[in-house]
């Protein structure tokens, strides 16, 4: 491995040192191989960036009446209500226990409407049945709870979600008629946040207990609330008050085993605004991932769509994939989940359009950015970490150099990558990115990429880059014997002779 090779070269320069000296150098070497900026290790071995598909495409056929090519996705799951035993399981309000909410369209109260009025035990009993139904076996996968009707932080329930505040205040006033409105509001806030916290925590704890191999988390958590992209001077940053509120949700991050922020785009966002929007949301999620334990951060999987939220039949262009996928990879997240509805798969024509989009734009870009990320990880981190932007707010991306690589779709529907990296390509990685170690490992960033002899990286379905950067050379013998001066050789032979006499004397005793 790279780290072992580094140590071997390091020590070869000190062949004539004493054992004590080597111990000292070993001790000094260890700290330089550590880093304080850890990333979550891969969920699947040798898959540093994971792609998941969470759309109802199971009945969609492409050209030649064949299923859509899902070979690049490690986890696949349909959000349809009757789909079970999937790689991605998403729980909506009607699929996990008795989630209390007020219908935003009809105003109908469901399960008491607010968390203070639900029986937590009844909810957990029902949730247990739902979990075993949707997850009959505990295979590795994602468990995403999508409850968006109310937010556990009181202050974040602004219009139209202020109905949950009003209903909570009314409940307190009914039970405590002597309280003023100010007093009732404060008490309602405390009761709502406690009940909401208990509801979310106990639900996810039950999920982890029953299906521990799944990655449990809540969709849209954490959120940045940086939606003000139409205002002048928009820079995408999260408001300080929202960062503080995310800090106050440490109880939720402590129980989660994954984070699922959202980076959906709409057509109202300019290219610059879209980039800044996504960049800051992913960055905040990565910051939050370290709140439970900075040395063992949670994996971050960004939920995205391949269409716009306000034009659900318009696919993202390659540039817009850069704003979403490219940003997420370059910032060091663990993966992306592509979510979708039946809208882009409702007919044979729409399925063919999706199939063509995947062949010509989506899958080639996934191959591009994934191979570039793996190549950078192999060169800079010896595959024991991920490459992260040195300047998080730059537009540096992990992409294959188009002058040196071509991604092609062969006749059989299989992608191939032609070309090989140059030393200049690797130097670009080193100039723009640094190595962030996985939390389970200690690693050393390669000091000089010029020492790279070869690159050998693959992703799903055998799509690989396998190339020598230097011509193979014959193994050289240690310089101490062949390239030493006569005086050095004499001294060496003298030392060897003394050692031989000592060993012989000990052996004869």
From Swiss-Prot:
GO cellular component: acrosomal vesicle; plasma membrane; side of membrane
Matches recorded under SUPFAM superfamilies: (Trans)glycosidases (SSF51445)
Organismal lineage: Eukaryota, Metazoa, Chordata, Craniata, Vertebrata
N-terminal signal peptide: 1-35
Any one GO BP annotation for this protein: cell adhesion
Molecular function in Gene Ontology: hyalurononglucosaminidase activity
Localization annotation: Cell membrane
Major location (coarse): membrane
Protein's job: Involved in sperm-egg adhesion. Upon fertilization sperm must first penetrate a layer of cumulus cells that surrounds the egg before reaching the zona pellucida. The cumulus cells are embedded in a matrix containing hyaluronic acid which is formed prior to ovulation. This protein aids in penetrating the layer of cumulus cells by digesting hyaluronic acid.
Enzyme class: hydrolase
Glycan-linked positions: 82, 166, 235, 254, 368, 393
Catalytic reaction annotation: Random hydrolysis of (1->4)-linkages between N-acetyl-beta-D-glucosamine and D-glucuronate residues in hyaluronate
Propeptide: 491-509
A Pfam short name: Glyco_hydro_56
EC number(s) given by UniProt: 3.2.1.35
Family under the similarity heading: Belongs to the glycosyl hydrolase 56 family.
Keywords, ordered alphabetically: Cell adhesion, Cell membrane, Disulfide bond, Glycoprotein, Glycosidase, GPI-anchor, Hydrolase, Lipoprotein, Membrane, Signal
Gene3D superfamilies: Aldolase class I
Free-text description of this protein's post-translational modifications in UniProt: N-glycosylated.
Topology versus the membrane: Lipid-anchor; GPI-anchor
UniProt KW rRNA processing keyword: no
Effect ascribed to mutating residue 148 to Q: Loss of activity
Keyword presence, Chloroplast: no
Annotated effect of mutating residue 287 to T: Loss of activity
Lipid tethering residues (GPI-anchor amidated serine): 490
Tissues expressed in: Testis.
Record's protein name: Hyaluronidase PH-20
């Amino acid at each position: 491995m790279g780290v072992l090779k580094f140590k071997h070269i390091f020590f070869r320069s000190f062949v004539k040192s004493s054992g004590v000296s080597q111990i000292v150098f070993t001790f000094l070497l260890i700290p330089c191989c550590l880093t304080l900026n850890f990333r979550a290790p891969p969920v699947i071995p040798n898959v540093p960036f994971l792609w998941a598909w969470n759309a109802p495409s199971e009945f969609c056929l492409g050209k030649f009446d064949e299923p859509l090519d899902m070979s690049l996705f490690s986890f696949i799951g349909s959000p349809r209500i009757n789909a079970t035993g999937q790689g991605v399981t998403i729980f909506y309000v009607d699929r996990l226990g008795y989630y209390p909410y007020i219908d935003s369209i009809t105003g109908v109260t469901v399960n008491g409407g607010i968390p203070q009025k639900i029986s937590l035990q009844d909810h957990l009993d029902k949730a247990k049945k739902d979990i075993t139904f949707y997850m009959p076996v505990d295979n590795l996968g994602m468990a995403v709870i999508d409850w968006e009707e109310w937010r556990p932080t009181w202050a974040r329930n602004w219009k139209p979600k202020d109905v949950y505040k009003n209903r909570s205040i009314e409940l307190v006033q009914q039970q405590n008629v002597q309280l003023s409105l100010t007093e009732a509001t404060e008490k309602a806030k405390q009761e709502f946040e406690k009940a909401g916290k208990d509801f979310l925590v106990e639900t996810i704890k039950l999920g982890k207990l029953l299906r521990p191999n799944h990655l449990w988390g809540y969709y849209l958590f954490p959120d940045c609330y940086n939606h003000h992209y139409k205002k002048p001077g928009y820079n995408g940053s999260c408001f300080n008050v929202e960062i503080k509120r995310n800090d106050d949700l440490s109880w939720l991050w402590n129980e989660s085993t994954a984070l699922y922020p959202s980076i959906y785009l709409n057509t109202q966002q300019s290219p610059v605004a879209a980039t800044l929007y996504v960049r800051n949301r992913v960055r905040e999620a990565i910051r939050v991932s370290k709140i439970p334990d900075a040395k063992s951060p949670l994996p971050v999987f960004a939920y995205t769509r391949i269409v716009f939220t306000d034009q659900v039949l318009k696919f993202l262009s390659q540039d817009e994939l850069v704003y979403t996928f490219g940003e997420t990879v370059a910032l060091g997240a663990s993966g992306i989940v592509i979510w979708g509805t039946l809208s882009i798969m409702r007919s044979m024509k729409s399925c063919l359009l999706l199939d063509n989009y995947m062949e010509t734009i989506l899958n080639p870009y996934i191959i591009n950015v994934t191979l570039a990320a793996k190549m950078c990880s192999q060169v800079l981190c010896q595959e024991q970490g991920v490459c992260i932007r040195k300047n998080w707010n730059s537009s540096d991306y992990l992409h294959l150099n188009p002058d040196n690589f071509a991604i092609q779709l062969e006749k059989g529907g299989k992608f191939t990558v032609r070309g090989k990296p140059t030393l200049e390509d690797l130097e670009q990685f080193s100039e723009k990115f640094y190595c962030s170690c996985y939390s389970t490992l200690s690693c050393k960033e390669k000091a000089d990429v010029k020492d790279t002899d070869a690159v050998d990286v693959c992703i799903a379905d055998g799509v690989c880059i396998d190339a020598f950067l230097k011509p193979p050379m014959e193994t050289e013998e240690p310089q101490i014997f062949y390239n030493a001066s006569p005086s050095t050789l004499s001294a060496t032979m003298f030392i060897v002779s003394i050692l031989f006499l000592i060993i012989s004397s000990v052996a004869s005793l």
